Amino acid sequence: MEGALTARDKVGVQDFVLLDAYTSESAFLENLRKRFRENLIYTYIGTLLVSVNPYQELGIYTASQMELYQGVNFFELPPHVYAIADNAYRMMCSELNNHFILISGESGAGKTEASKKILQYFAVTCPMTESLQIARDRLLLSIPVLEAFGNAKTLRNDNSSRFGKYMDIQFDFQGVPVGGHIISYLIEKSRVVYQNHGERNFHIFYQLLAGGGSERLASLGLERDPQLYKYLSQGHCARESPISDKNDWETVCGAFSVIGFTEADLENLFGIIASVLHLGNVCFKGDKQGCASVPDTHEIKWIAKLLGVCPAVLLEALTHRKIEAKTEEVICPLTVELSVYARDAMAKAVYGRTFTWLVNRINSSLVNKDFTQKTVIGLLDIYGFEVFDKNGFEQFCINYCNEKLQQLLIERTLKAEQAEYESEGIEWETVQYFNNKIICDLVEERHRGIISILDEECIRPGPATDLSFLEKLEEKVGKHAHFQTRKLAGPKGRKRIGWLEFCLLHYAGEVTYCTKGFLEKNNDLLYRHLKEVLCSSKNSILRECFLVAELENRRRPPTVGTQFKNSLSSLLEILISKEPSYIRCIKPNERKEPSKFDDFLISHQIKYLGLMEHLRVRRAGFAYRRKYEHFLQRYKSLCPDTWPHWHGPPGEGVERLIKYIGYQPQDYKLGKTKIFIRFPRTLFATEDAFEFSKHQLVSRIQATYKGCLGRREYMKKRQAATKLEAHWRGVLARKEIKRRRWAVQIIRRFVKGFINRDKPLCPDNEEFVVLVRKNYILNLRYHVPKNVLDKSWLRPPGILENASNLLRRMCTRNLVRKYCRGISAERKAMMQQKVVTSEIFRGKKEGYAESLNQLFAGSRLGVSTSSLSDGILVIHISPADKQQKGDVILQCEHIFEVATKLAMLIRKEHTVRVVQGSLQFYVSPGREGTIVFETGEEDQVYKDKNGQLRVVSAGKKT
């Protein structure tokens, strides 16, 4: 906000508290004008928001704007309706108390739009879950439905609320909107049957005709032209260009679907709306006796069809009146005038009760079935102060309501604030203001107020008229300073007050009321005959609106004025129990033109809204005050002396706290029970410090809590591990005991078997013998002889001697068998020779035993001869024995016979070699010689000079 002060000459100040000439009304007005010209429609007076209706779209209600104001301190950004909404929401969440936002101002000042913007802000910015999305949508879409049935175009406002509305938005402990509740006040039923020139009936009638499908209109017996219906054509502005009835109809139908209206509900609802239009077109004609009749019953038939009643009974109820006299019932015909009254009374009653049913139906869809405690923010959007050329009973009630709200504002701001300073002992210069309690008492005082006088006149015996009511007012309250009639006024006043009028000096100025219709509208009576017809309706909505029990109740119902007074009292009780926020709406001109600033009109509103008095109180006062207990409870974490608990008096704790924070003497005052902080910036700094401290505390609490959870989890796991370990150790111990018991039994059986091992097989040694056998067999497999020459054998136990011998023989046989199967034929022959040798020489010749391990060699003898015709034969002897001479060289004539017999003798035919050229032979071990075979002329054998033996053959062998 401070950044905007540099541009204050052009756009004014954002807070009227910053005005230098804060006591000057002209300076106030000029600041408002500067901001209005720059399209800055919002200005603060402290925490009160002043809003000027721009009559145009400004583009300041976007989602980005909502996000900008979300969670920001109140004065950090320019004034906005979102700031009021966000401040109320944050205060509600932090302090868990209920709030309400009071939006006040003249009709056409923008109250309804302000309430819609606040509702949209809550819907968009509040935390939301998918399951609560429906509740939020229903809350939002209830607004266009209520506007369609309760708003209308007036001379001053195209969308004027013709009923009072208080809406509670319910939030859970997390700040999530979970539901809502709506209370309606005094819908202007007279508008159903009559509108001033330039005004319209309720929007829903025009929306149905403009947007309803052809089939729907045909089923309701309606035409699209509103001018065809008397109840819609009296204002001569049925089709108003700024209002798009067709688009609004689509919005309303979509809202009905989201809120949860069934098709049957809509059929019955639109049937009632259509029946009201048909009622307005019912015409009456009087006969010679003055009795009314309906010449054309076309409309009657449609009404009967739509409401589900008998046409004949309905016609009789509109033209006759049933009078009960003790035990008799008398039906009297009505005049045309009374029939018109009955028709209009029926239309008003049907529409008024249907509107009440609609509000209750919406409430049932908004109700939250969770009965946990909730906080609420209330939105009060109620008709503004109205002054027309001709003001009737409705304007009287509306302006009385505004007087009560003005009184509430005075009580909660001007009067209460100054009284608080005095009671707390704070030095204060009293600000004078007009207290409108005197006007409220004039209207509502019991037995002496205008409403009480009106009720007395309605119920007194004898003919009561509007004139007699005016005379009674002159008699009872004629001396009141704020009441005037033509008879009581001076010469100047008589010119502006008619003979049937009285004038009240309201807080907003003088208003003249015409008493014509006061008694009728206050009674709001519906003939019993018509009630009976409506109670018999087959329309489910009407059956809920008109109960048969009403016919049995003979007591006179409360008048409209009394009902309205009681409902206002209940409303004020609701508002007093909540923390307030205020929005004061100002209408810039009467013509609804953008950028037009009417100084006189705005100055008048500034005066009667009490803005100057509020500014003076705010300028001289303190921006924030709180009881010591609450202040200390909230901010005690900022001071070590007060955290976590302060055990002394709260006042001393607060004093210690602000001293530690560093408050300057001019920033605050300490009262008897409260602390008063003068400047918002001081509170903001404290709140920022608290937020920082809160984050630190939260972090510490989280760490401690997580540590606690971790320790708890660790101890849990440790106990589980200990228990698991104990159980496992028990399992292992039991297994060990079982194993040892088994071992003891085994050892015992083993010892017993060992002792009895030599006895015949019996139970005492059976297991031992089996074990010994098993072990012996297992060990024997690793000590079996590898060949037939290996005579080793594992020594058997005594009990296995026989088995061991048997196994040994089997093993030996197996080895011999394997050896025999693996011997070659040559070796077999050699072994056979060994057998023959054994038979010849064993025990007879020395050296035989040493020769046993020597195999007979097949190559020990060999025979060689040449391929020539010589008779040379060489017998080769193995040179292994060094004592032997060399090979034997023979020459014989019968070489073929000798060689053959030698070969047969050694059984090796291949031992005889036939060589060519030469052959080698051993002369002695280690010394070789050579025989060379060649041919010549004659046979000869000689040794050449090289020492080689040469054998010459005269011819080749043949």
Curated annotation (Swiss-Prot):
**InterPro entries per record:** IQ_motif_EF-hand-BS, Kinesin_motor_dom_sf, Myosin_head_motor_dom-like, Myosin_TH1, MYSc_Myo1, P-loop_NTPase
Q: Which GO terms describe its cellular component?
A: cluster of actin-based cell projections; myosin complex
Q: Which SUPFAM superfamilies match?
A: P-loop containing nucleoside triphosphate hydrolases
Q: What is this protein called?
A: Unconventional myosin-Ih
Example GO molecular function: ATP binding
**Which part of the chain is the TH1 domain?**
773-955
Q: Which organism is it from?
A: Mus musculus (Mouse)
The IQ domain extends over 694-716, 717-746
Q: Does the keyword Disulfide bond apply?
A: no
Q: What does this protein do?
A: Myosins are actin-based motor molecules with ATPase activity. Unconventional myosins serve in intracellular movements. Their highly divergent tails are presumed to bind to membranous compartments, which would be moved relative to actin filaments.
What's the family?
Belongs to the TRAFAC class myosin-kinesin ATPase superfamily. Myosin family.
Record keywords, A-Z: Actin-binding, ATP-binding, Motor protein, Myosin, Nucleotide-binding, Phosphoprotein, Repeat
The PTM Phosphoserine maps to: S365
Q: Write out the ranges of the annotated region (Actin-binding).
A: 568-590
